[in-house]
Structures are given as C-alpha cells and as structure tokens.
Amino acid sequence: MHFETVIGLEVHVELKTDSKMFSPSPAHFGAEPNSNTNVIDLAYPGVLPVVNKRAVDWAMRAAMALNMEIATESKFDRKNYFYPDNPKAYQISQFDQPIGENGYIDIEVDGETKRIGITRLHMEEDAGKSTHKGEYSLVDLNRQGTPLIEIVSEPDIRSPIEAYAYLEKLRSIIQYTGVSDVKMEEGSLRCDANISLRPYGQEKFGTKAELKNLNSFNYVRKGLEYEEKRQEEELLNGGEIGQETRRFDESTGKTILMRVKEGSDDYRYFPEPDIVPLYIDDAWKKRVRQTIPELPDERKAKYVNELGLPAYDAHVLTLTKEMSDFFESTIEHGADVKLTSNWLMGGVNEYLNKNQVELLDTKLTPENLAGMIKLIEDGTMSSKIAKKVFPELAAKGGNAKQIMEDNGLVQISDEATLLKFVNEALDNNEQSVEDYKNGKGKAMGFLVGQIMKASKGQANPQLVNQLLKQELDKR
C-alpha cells in the first residue's frame, strides 16, 4: 500500500512593535529577565488590557500580503490553560473571528509552481518563557504579552520539501512587509507542523500528529521526514496513529511523544469580556493596504523581465529583503547586473556562511562592492585577484583598488612582462605545444593555467590568451 503525506503548518510570527499587545511594556528581545513587565503582564487583579493599534495594523498588513480577506468585525477570545509562564491562566487569542481568512502563497519546488492555501491569520499574545534547571524552573515574563500573529496553512502540503519551500516563502513575504524580523534564533518566528498519512486516492484525512521543538527550517524538514517514515511503518504493520503531540530531538533526528493532543474544547474558548470587538471599515483597510511595499514575487518578475536575470538568480536574490535591497543599490552604483548577481550568490554568500554573519554585519557596502565589480569589468582586476581582495573588503571595508595595491595584487598587463611568462610556459611544456598544433583544445587551457600559476594569478587573463595564441602560431 502506498500513502500520501498531508501536512499543515502553524507559524507564529512576533510583530516588531515597540510595546506589547495589551500593555505599554517594551517588547524588545534580549532585556534582563522580568525587566520588560508591568501589572498587566503580571496579571494583577483589576487591571485591564488595551489593544495595541500598531499591532492590529501590522497583522492586517501581513494578512493582505498573504492574499487574505480582512474581516469587517474581529474579536478576541480567552484560551484557557494553566502554566507557570502564563500568569493569567488564559491567553488572549482569536477563535472564531480572526482578522484574516482565505489566503494563499505560491511556492516553487523542482521548477513547478504550487499554490498553498492559508486558512487564517489571527492575533494573540505570547506567553513567558520557562527555563528548567535541575529540580526547579525559572520564569521570565519579558515575552509575556508580546504581539503575535499565527498563520495557519491549509493541509495542502504534500512533502517535507514543500513544507520547507512554504516556510522560506512565508518568511520572505513577512520580512518584506517589515512587520517582523522573522528570526528563528530569537524566537520571532516559530513553527509547529501537523502531519498525517492516508492511502492514495482516499479523501478522508488520517489521524495527525503535531510536531514541536522545530527550531530551524531544516529541523522542520527533518522532523517531518522522520515522522513520515514512522507513521508509514506503523500503518504497514497494522498499527494505528494516535492524535498526539511529539517533540523533535535534534541529537537523534527522531520525534518523541510529549502528550496526547488536546482539541479546541480542552481550552474552553470564550469571548474576551474586557476587549470590545474590532470594527474594520474600508477606509482603515485602504490605509493599511497603501503601506504594503514591493513584495518578493514583484521584485522577482522585475529582475527577470526588466534586468534580464535568469529565474534562478532572481529567486535567490529575492529570498531576503536585505540581499535584494543590497543588489539593487549595488547596480545603482553602476555595477554590471549579472556580475553583481554572481558575486552576491557566490562570493558574498560563501563569506557570510563561512563567518556565520549577516550581510549588514559586514563592512561591505553597495558602493565598495560596485567599485570592485567595475574593476573586474574594465580588466583592472581579474576574478582570481578579486577573490583574494574580497575577504578584506568585507571584513574591513575600504576601497578594492587600494586593497589590491597594498597587498601587491595589481594585475600584470605589461606585454613584455607577460611575454616572459608565456614563453617560459611554452619552453617548459613542449608536449602541450604539440598537442595544440594537433588540434587538442585542452592544451590551450593547460598552458593558460601554467602562466596564471607562474604569475600567482596576477596576469591579465585576456592579454594572456591573446599573447599565448600569438606565440603558439609562431612555433
């Protein structure tokens, strides 16, 4: 029997507001424990929540960017559960009247475009954070009350790879809107995954398991891959899948049972009596819609249709707004479009990954990168020399030409000097000269390599090719 995988994702995104969802406390990451709290966050008797209008605006902006319908009337509800980092013993969320519904995003997998539906986007407050140490636990309520949006996909995802692509695209769109940093390492983007299997051709969904502790997109993919295999083996062996919550163990790559999954009835939702419903008229919707910036799909189309970039380049460059903005600014400084794309996707990304830094944490600027690329364009600097210059340019900033000169990397373009390298290579490699004369094209490449090696990569490659052909024809 063959099974079809059915996946739905629930993504929590922390909104980048200055204050919390229902209190004036700061909503900043990294403060001393319990320093960003007040009487509302601590659930003192008699205090009342006040809705953060900026958070509502940003929830609407995100929903619109995800092609969602914005509710005319939306209300808040109490989700009841007890946990030490939830001092009210309930969370203010939205149940049956979310702010956004019926959206979608398009993802690309293996060159194919697929539309993934989004059921709803609702607002809620975050809980605090518990840290367990031995026989006791520490509670930090700085995060308590931080504004969140939860984005719930339709069960349209059919593989862990599609789940990864969905998360990548969702993060990109939210980042472009400016409503969140969407940094998993800081908790401003978190994901729970629901997965079930059903026999191919069957319409009824199988029993789902919810996966938690998915702290990176790779862990989402790996957790789903493991759970896919676990459920398939269980079903093939005649077993049943229980509705349960499971935790992904990073060290083993397996999922571990946490608890039997609760249903919405277990939370005893009821309308929040201390907050009146939101009434969102057309004027408010129009005002928010006008704040939506250019989104990744629009930029991607522009890069392909107006700048002539391949679709792959456009996809990579628009994955993050940071990279896309940097690309646009670099070509505005006069750098060649394709060379800039190649450097950002290649040398720049390689440097960022190797040093575990973000682009904006380096000394690289659109201006100094454009300066280096223009030196490559006009033949002043070879690509090989550029690779030696670039790490210092990224680490210290400055001017690529100056770095090249200071390190004795100036490209050799003097014909007399180059002829010495050329003739030396020809004298030392007579067999390659014969091979070239006999029509073996690879011999030319070999000889160029020998010349570049002898000149420590500083020979002007265009002149080398020209002079080498000239000298070969004489022999």
UniProtKB/Swiss-Prot annotation:
This entry's Enzyme Commission designation comes to 6.3.5.-
PANTHER family in UniProt: GLUTAMYL-TRNA GLN AMIDOTRANSFERASE SUBUNIT B MITOCHONDRIAL AND PROKARYOTIC PET112-RELATED, GLUTAMYL-TRNA(GLN) AMIDOTRANSFERASE SUBUNIT B, MITOCHONDRIAL
UniProt keywords, alphabetically:
ATP-binding, Ligase, Nucleotide-binding, Protein biosynthesis
**Which branch of life, at top level?**
Bacteria
One of the record's GO molecular function terms = ATP binding
Transmembrane as a keyword of this entry, yes or no, is no
Pfam families, per the entry: GatB_N, GatB_Yqey
Q: Write down the top EC class of this protein.
A: ligase
Q: Which biological process terms from the Gene Ontology are attached to this UniProt entry?
A: glutaminyl-tRNAGln biosynthesis via transamidation; translation
This enzyme catalyses: L-glutamyl-tRNA(Gln) + L-glutamine + ATP + H2O = L-glutaminyl-tRNA(Gln) + L-glutamate + ADP + phosphate + H(+); L-aspartyl-tRNA(Asn) + L-glutamine + ATP + H2O = L-asparaginyl-tRNA(Asn) + L-glutamate + ADP + phosphate + 2 H(+)
Q: Tell me the protein family, please.
A: Belongs to the GatB/GatE family. GatB subfamily.
Q: How does it assemble?
A: Heterotrimer of A, B and C subunits.
Function noted in UniProt: Allows the formation of correctly charged Asn-tRNA(Asn) or Gln-tRNA(Gln) through the transamidation of misacylated Asp-tRNA(Asn) or Glu-tRNA(Gln) in organisms which lack either or both of asparaginyl-tRNA or glutaminyl-tRNA synthetases. The reaction takes place in the presence of glutamine and ATP through an activated phospho-Asp-tRNA(Asn) or phospho-Glu-tRNA(Gln).
InterPro entries named among the record's database cross-references = Asn/Gln-tRNA_amidoTrfase_suB/E (IPR017959), Asn/Gln-tRNA_Trfase_suB/E_cat (IPR006075), Asn/Gln_amidotransferase (IPR018027), Asn/Gln_tRNA_amidoTrase-B-like (IPR003789), GatB (IPR004413), GatB_C_1 (IPR042114), GatB_Yqey_C_2 (IPR023168), Gln-tRNA_amidoTrfase_suB_CS (IPR017958)
What is the species listed in this Swiss-Prot or TrEMBL entry? Answer: Staphylococcus aureus (strain bovine RF122 / ET3-1)
Q: What is the name attached to this protein's record?
A: Aspartyl/glutamyl-tRNA(Asn/Gln) amidotransferase subunit B
Q: Which gene encodes it?
A: gatB
